Curated annotation (Swiss-Prot):
GO terms for cellular component: extracellular region. It is found in: Secreted. Homotrimer; non-covalently linked. PROSITE patterns: C_TYPE_LECTIN_1, C_TYPE_LECTIN_2. This phospholipase A2 inhibitor binds directly phospholipase A2 in the presence or absence of calcium. This is Phospholipase A2 inhibitor clone 02/03/06/07. Residues 46-161 form the C-type lectin domain.
Amino acid sequence: MRLILLSGLLLLGTFLANGHDTDPEGQMLNSVIESVMILQREFANLKHAFLTVHKARSFGSGSERLYVSNKEIGKFEALKEICDQAGGHIPSPQFENQNKAFANVLERHNKEAYLVVDDPANFTNWAAGQPNEADGTCVKADTHGSWHSASCDDNLLVVCEFYFIL
């Protein structure tokens, strides 16, 4: 994309250098070039701002994943839909630092939330005596980040997981 823009600008520069910048088409072309250059700078600034915020959030949590709550509560299927619509998903911590970042959200709100455990899981943080399918087929995390079997009909805090591929 940049190569095409640069090639176009080079050809345009050659055209304008031949004295065509005084006619209406040349002036319009100059205006378009200026607009493209402004848009390129704005895009670079937005990209830098986004990456700075992402790095700051990652630095604070120790995780490349971001765990966010909208403070609502609900059952598993409703929460799954909320997270899907937001572009995220129900948390699925794969490492201890991700589980800690998730637990920080739960501790801040003093509530439990659903999570999804991959099968087979690379990382688990089951509480003593867990999992216990008699308690349910879903999994919830407490405010300390320990995992427990739970009913999928429990009303728990909405927490969605987001991650960026950079």
